C-alpha cells in the first residue's frame, strides 16, 4: 500500500508482475519517491508487446519524476555504504568494498564475474545490473560511479548499445579522471546478437565499428571473463605500468617464443 508509507523512501525496489509495474511506479511518484529498481521481467526482451509496455513504463516514470534502473535487472550494490538493492547471491561471503566498479547488462553473468573479482581479492565498490535500460543506460550508470574517488578502475559487460555517443562520453570522462575502462562486449556474430536481443533487448552494433571506437578512445576490450579479470588485477594495483616496454623471463625457450610473438601482436617491445 504505497500511499500509506509514512514518508517517501530514497529508493523503491519493485518486484511485482510486469502488468502491475506501471501502476506501482505512478503510485511511487505520487508518494514522492524519485528512484526505483525494477526486477520484474516481461518487457522489451519478450517482443513487440513487451516493447510497447516498456515504452509506456518509460513515459510514466518520466512524468512521475522517477529515474529507473531496469526493468529485468538484478539491481545494484554500493558496498562502500552497505547498500544492497539486489535479490542475487552477491552478498554471500566477503563483500568488502574495493576500487573496482562493475556494470553489467547480464545479471547472472555479472554476479558470477563479481564473485570471481572478489575471489581474486580485488574488492568491488559498485555492482550494477542494468537490465533493459528503459531509463538509465549502461553508460549513464557507469559514468555516475566512476565519479566516486574511491573507484580506481571500471569494468563492464555489454551485449548491445543503446547510445553510442554516451559510451564515447563515458570513455572521455574515464580518460580525464585517469581511470581505466575495461569492457567485455559479446554478440560478435549474428547468433550472439540474436541471443542478446532476446535476453535484455540489447541493440546489435557492428563489431568492427565498436572495436575501432574503443581503440580510438583508449578503452580496453577484454576477450573473455578471464582476460577481464587479469586486466582488473593489473590495473587495480597501487602502481600501474606505463609505456609499452616488456621483459620476459622464462625457463622454457618455447614459451618465451610464444610470449614474444604475442607481445609483438599487442604492440609491446
Regions found by a protein language model. Give the residues of each.
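Catalytic-core regions of core metabolic enzymes
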Residues: 1-269
Amino acid at each position: 500500500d504505497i500511499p500509506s508509507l509514512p514518508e517517501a523512501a530514497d529508493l523503491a525496489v519493485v518486484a511485482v508482475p510486469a502488468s502491475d509495474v506501471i501502476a506501482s511506479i505512478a503510485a511511487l511518484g505520487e508518494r514522492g519517491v524519485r528512484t526505483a529498481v525494477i526486477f520484474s521481467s516481461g518487457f522489451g526482451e519478450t517482443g513487440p508487446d513487451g516493447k510497447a509496455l516498456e515504452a509506456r513504463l518509460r513515459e510514466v516514470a518520466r512524468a512521475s519524476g522517477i529515474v529507473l534502473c531496469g526493468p529485468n535487472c538484478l539491481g545494484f550494490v554500493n558496498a562502500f555504504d552497505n547498500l544492497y538493492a539486489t535479490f542475487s547471491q552477491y552478498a554471500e561471503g566477503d563483500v568488502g568494498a574495493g576500487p573496482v566498479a562493475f556494470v553489467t547488462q547480464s545479471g547472472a553473468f555479472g554476479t558470477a564475474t563479481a564473485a570471481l573479482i572478489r575471489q581474486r581479492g580485488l574488492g568491488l565498490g559498485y555492482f550494477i545490473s542494468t537490465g533493459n535500460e528503459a531509463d538509465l543506460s549502461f553508460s549513464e550508470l557507469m559514468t555516475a560511479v566512476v565519479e566516486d574517488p574511491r573507484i580506481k578502475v571500471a569494468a563492464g559487460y555489454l551485449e548491445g548499445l543503446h547510445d553510442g555517443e554516451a559510451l564515447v562520453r563515458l570513455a572521455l570522462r574515464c580518460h580525464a579522471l585517469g581511470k581505466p575502462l575495461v569492457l567485455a562486449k559479446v554478440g560478435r556474430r549474428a547468433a550472439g546478437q540474436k541471443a542478446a536481443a532476446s535476453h535484455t533487448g540489447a541493440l546489435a552494433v557492428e563489431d568492427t565499428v565498436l572495436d575501432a571506437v574503443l581503440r580510438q578512445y583508449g578503452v580496453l576490450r577484454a576477450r573473455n571473463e578471464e582476460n577481464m579479470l587479469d586486466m582488473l588485477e593489473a590495473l587495480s594495483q597501487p602502481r600501474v605500468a606505463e609505456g609499452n616496454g616488456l621483459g620476459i623471463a622464462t625457463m622454457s625457450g618455447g614459451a618465451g617464443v610464444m610470449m614474444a610473438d604475442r607481445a609483438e601482436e599487442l604492440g609491446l617491445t
